[in-house]
Amino acid sequence: METLKSENKKRVLPSWMTAPVDEKRELSVKTPKRKKIAAGQVGLATRAPVMKTVYCMNEAEMVDVALGILIEGRKQEEPTLVAPDKPQPSPPYSASPHTSSPGSSSEKEDSGNRWPALGLSPSHGPEAADSPCSRSPEEEEEDALKYVREIFFS
């Protein structure tokens, strides 16, 4: 029973737990690390930050931008198709599809309905839109979707 008493027990501690710690040496080891970290942060602060621009668009915005680009491209191609002696002024396009808000799709739809009429001769004018020779809205939509498919899936 004598072995169970705490007076008789001696614990043996590992050497790293019993060795006296030199506080000066421990501080000198930590100090250079802190200086390196601080120097690294100063170096980061002196360099110009790298700016990356990320554009995020949903599918509807991508289609709007693509259609706007196609419409602009078609407007640029049509003056070359028209005879040089009869230049037709293109209708003003107030908003760029790149800067317009998603809520302004009515302007894009209006301009989309105008571009097929640009190829008509001056004698036809806007009244020709109601004639049986004009394209149906389904054909116009299919034509626009054809360009979108061509851009995104080829």
UniProtKB/Swiss-Prot annotation:
UniProt-annotated location(s): Cytoplasm; Nucleus; Chromosome
Domain of life: Eukaryota
Protein name as catalogued: Cell cycle regulator of non-homologous end joining
Biological process per Gene Ontology, one example term: immunoglobulin V(D)J recombination
InterPro entries given in the database record: MRI
Biased composition (Low complexity): 95-105
Species the sequence originates in: Cricetulus griseus
Motif (XLM): 144-154
Extent of motif KBM: 1-21
One of the record's GO cellular component terms: site of double-strand break
Assembly: Interacts (via KBM motif) with XRCC5/Ku80 and XRCC6/Ku70 heterodimer. Interacts (via XLF motif) with TRIM28/KAP1, ATM, MRE11, NBN and RAD50. Interacts with splicing factor SF3B1. Interacts with ERCC6L2; this interaction is DNA independent.
Modification N-acetylmethionine occurs at: 1
